[in-house]
């Protein structure tokens, strides 16, 4: 059921942190030939491992259209099936974080979704593909599949990757994304902040200036920043002053060092290095896309927004991207230190970042509740 006459905050709901217990995770089977090399064939084996790891510790809801379900079932046939659920919900691409529902809970056993508008990261202004109607309709269907009610955020455009919360009243976003002309150009920064507070049940928004260099989402926060726990955060970093990421991360650090969260705490900040070598599209990869008219294209040599911060926290685990870079091991070390209670699971991510995001972008958590 769609709730149009109230907001989560008015009803006592809030968005819990990703590090809180999950009931499950949404994923979408990757097949879009303009996003994934060889129509998904290169990235699908990574999805198998991702599904293996997540479904071992929580329910896994996999969106896959009827045409591709036999393919998905065949590739997943060797995995235990009791926690894998197939949902016949069509989408235009596979970014469950951005097109799926954002979940809120009330601490009294109720869980609801939020239905934001989705316009493929910028609509007519700078969106990545022109036909995104199935993506925009998916959140309502995803909530319906789980029997969850859904708040209607009206015409407000937002992607799940553009927000991070601590579950204790603090929201972190980037100005580069939320103030971009392709999202909500008729709303002021103050109006956008008011919407975030009302719908996420929060008390304070911290605006970081920038995200990761060359991030085609207009620099989503989930690629540059993440919460470890309330009052403790990770920031993507480089010490190389000649790298274009240096100034972006420096600007974010200055904000975080001077900020306090909704409960007045100063942040403990951990710097998480970006890959030592820029991760770029190869000529072979560029040739293995099939683009539709009006779709954003990949070019050989194009630098990708590779970041270890785009990890995903499922129950008891950290799913960590690996790029075949010398910083891979350092990222494992830092994440292991930050999350001693979790198992760090490194998975190969080059085939994922070629699509434009990483494990956090692909997933959308469903918070656990006491029924």
UniProtKB/Swiss-Prot annotation:
Output one GO BP term: putrescine biosynthetic process
> One GO molecular-function annotation for this sequence?
agmatine deiminase activity
Into which EC class is this enzyme placed? hydrolase
Reaction it catalyzes: agmatine + H2O = N-carbamoylputrescine + NH4(+)
- Entry keywords, A to Z: Hydrolase
Give the E.C. number(s): 3.5.3.12
Q: Per its UniProt record, what NCBIfam families does this chain match?
A: agmatine_aguA (TIGR03380), PRK13551.1 (NF010070)
Cite the PANTHER family for this sequence: AGMATINE DEIMINASE-RELATED
The protein's name in its UniProt record? Putative agmatine deiminase
What is the native source organism of this protein?
Selenomonas ruminantium
């Amino acid at each position: 059921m769609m709730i149009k006459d109230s907001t989560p905050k008015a009803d006592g709901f809030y968005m819990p942190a990703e590090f809180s217990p999950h009931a499950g995770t949404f994923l979408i089977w990757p097949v879009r030939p303009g996003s994934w090399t060889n129509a998904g064939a290169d990235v699908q084996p990574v999805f198998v491992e991702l599904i293996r790891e997540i479904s071992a510790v929580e329910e896994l809801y996999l969106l896959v259209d009827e045409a591709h379900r036999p393919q998905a079932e065949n590739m997943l046939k060797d995995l235990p099936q009791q926690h894998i659920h197939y949902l016949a919900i069509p989408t235009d691409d596979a970014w469950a974080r951005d097109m799926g529902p954002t979940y809120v809970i009330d601490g009294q056993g109720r869980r609801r979704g939020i239905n934001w508008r989705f316009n493929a990261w910028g609509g007519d202004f700078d969106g990545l593909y022109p036909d995104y109607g199935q993506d925009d309709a998916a959140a309502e269907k995803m909530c319906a599949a789980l029997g969850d009610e859904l708040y209607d955020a009206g015409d407000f455009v937002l992607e799940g990757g553009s927000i991070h919360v601590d579950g204790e009243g603090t929201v972190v976003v980037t100005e580069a994304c939320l103030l971009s002309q392709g999202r909500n150009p008729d709303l002021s920064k103050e109006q956008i902040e008011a919407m975030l507070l009302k719908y996420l049940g929060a008390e304070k928004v911290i605006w970081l200036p920038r995200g990761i260099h060359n991030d085609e989402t207009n620099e989503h926060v989930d690629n540059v920043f993440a919460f470890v726990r309330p009052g403790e955060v990770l920031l993507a970093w480089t010490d190389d002053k000649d790298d274009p990421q240096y100034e972006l991360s420096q600007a974010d650090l200055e904000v975080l060092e001077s900020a306090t969260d909704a409960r007045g705490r100063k942040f403990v900040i951990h710097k998480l290095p970006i890959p030592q070598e820029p991760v770029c599209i190869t000529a072979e990869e560029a040739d293995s896309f099939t683009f539709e008219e009006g779709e954003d294209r990949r070019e050989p040599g194009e630098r990708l927004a590779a970041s270890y911060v785009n990890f995903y926290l499922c129950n008891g685990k950290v799913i960590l991207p690996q790029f075949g870079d010398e910083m891979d091991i350092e990222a494992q070390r830092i994440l292991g230190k930050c999350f001693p209670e979790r198992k760090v699971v490194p998975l190969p991510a080059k085939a994922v970042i070629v699509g434009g995001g990483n494990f956090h972008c692909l997933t959308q958590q469903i918070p656990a509740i006491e029924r």
